[in-house]
Curated annotation (Swiss-Prot):
Catalytic activity: 5-amino-1-(5-phospho-D-ribosyl)imidazole-4-carboxylate + L-aspartate + ATP = (2S)-2-[5-amino-1-(5-phospho-beta-D-ribosyl)imidazole-4-carboxamido]succinate + ADP + phosphate + 2 H(+)
GO biological process annotation, one example: 'de novo' IMP biosynthetic process
Pathway: Purine metabolism; IMP biosynthesis via de novo pathway; 5-amino-1-(5-phospho-D-ribosyl)imidazole-4-carboxamide from 5-amino-1-(5-phospho-D-ribosyl)imidazole-4-carboxylate: step 1/2
A molecular function GO annotation: ATP binding
Enzyme class, spelled out: ligase
Sequence similarity: Belongs to the SAICAR synthetase family.
EC number: 6.3.2.6
Gene: purC
Source species of the chain: Pediococcus pentosaceus (strain ATCC 25745 / CCUG 21536 / LMG 10740 / 183-1w)
Coiled coil: none
Organism domain of life: Bacteria
Lineage of source species: Bacteria, Bacillati, Bacillota, Bacilli, Lactobacillales
The keyword Ligase belongs to this UniProt entry's keyword annotation: yes
Keywords of the record: ATP-binding, Ligase, Nucleotide-binding, Purine biosynthesis
Name this polypeptide is given: Phosphoribosylaminoimidazole-succinocarboxamide synthase
C-alpha cells in the first residue's frame, strides 16, 4: 500500500490517494481550529492524539455492527479509510444542553434530555454551517426522506454505543457531531472522525470539560486534555474486551 497524490487538506486532516483506487490515506495534522476555521493554532501532538482516539472509537463502532469508512490504523497519526462521497450534512446528537443549544433556548448547562436530540446542519464554512431541517435538505436534494431516516437511525445507534463506551472511561458524552458518506455502491456509512474535536465530553463526577471547548474558551491545555481522554479510553479497553 502506497500513499500517492494529495486529494485535499482540511482543517485537521490531509487526504491522499493510494495505489488502490477505493482507499484513501488519512493524515491527522497538528492543527486546532475554532469559529469555522477563522482561528487556527499549531499544536504539537494533537494529530497523533486525535487519530488514536478516533481509531479506538471507530473500531468499537465497527465491532458493534456500524458500517463505516474505517479500514485500519496505519500509524499514530495516520489511518486508512474507504473512499466515500461525503454527504454535506453535519449530524449532531445531543444528550444534554450545552453550546449553541443552551444559548438558543436559555436552559441550564448539562440539563439532561429525556431522549437524544438529533439535528442536521448544512456543511458550509461560508454559510457558517446553518441549521437545516429535513424538508429543506430534501428540497435542496442533499438527501431524500429515506436517507434522512437512515441518518437519524444510525446517529442514534452510534450515540448509544459511544455513551456506553465513554461511560466506561468515566466520561459523559454531552453531544457530538458526525458526518456520513456514500461508497461507490451507494451505501451510506459513518465517515470523517470522532474525537474530542467533534464531541463534548465531561468528567462523570466533576463535570470538568475534556474536549475542544478548552481551546475554544481558552480554559486549559488541549494536548493535556486530549491525552487524558486517550489514557482513559486505553485504560478501560480491557474491561470492554473482557
Amino acid at each position: 500500500m502506497k500513499k500517492t497524490t494529495l486529494i485535499k487538506e482540511g482543517k485537521a486532516k490531509r487526504l491522499y490517494n493510494t495505489d488502490e483506487k477505493d482507499l484513501v490515506w488519512v493524515e491527522y495534522m497538528d492543527q486546532a481550529t475554532a469559529l469555522n476555521g477563522k482561528r487556527k493554532d499549531h499544536i504539537a501532538g494533537k494529530g497523533e492524539l486525535n487519530n488514536q482516539i478516533d481509531c479506538i472509537l471507530f473500531e468499537q463502532l465497527v465491532a458493534k455492527g456500524i458500517h463505516t469508512d474505517f479500514v485500519q490504523k496505519l500509524s499514530n497519526n495516520e489511518q486508512l479509510n474507504r473512499k466515500v462521497k461525503i454527504i454535506p450534512l453535519e449530524v449532531v446528537v445531543r444528550n444534554a444542553a450545552s453550546g449553541s443549544f443552551q444559548r438558543k433556548f436559555d436552559v441550564s448547562y448539562l440539563q439532561a434530555f429525556d431522549q437524544p436530540v438529533v439535528e442536521f446542519f448544512y456543511k458550509s464554512d461560508e454559510l457558517d454551517d446553518p441549521f437545516i431541517n429535513t424538508n429543506k435538505a430534501i428540497a435542496l436534494k442533499i438527501i431524500d426522506l429515506e436517507e434522512s431516516q437512515r441518518l437519524e437511525k444510525m446517529a442514534l445507534e452510534i450515540n448509544q454505543i459511544l455513551k456506553e463506551r465513554f461511560a466506561k472511561a468515566h466520561l459523559q458524552l454531552v453531544d457530538f457531531k458526525v458526518e456520513f458518506g456514500k461508497t461507490a455502491d451507494d451505501e451510506i456509512v459513518l465517515a470523517d472522525e470522532i474525537s474530542p474535536d467533534s464531541c463534548r465530553l465531561v468528567d462523570l463526577t466533576t463535570k470538568e470539560s475534556l474536549d475542544k471547548d478548552v481551546f475554544r474558551k481558552k480554559t486549559g491545555d488541549l494536548v493535556t486534555v486530549y491525552q487524558e481522554v486517550l489514557n482513559r479510553l486505553n485504560n478501560s479497553q480491557e474491561e470492554v474486551h473482557g
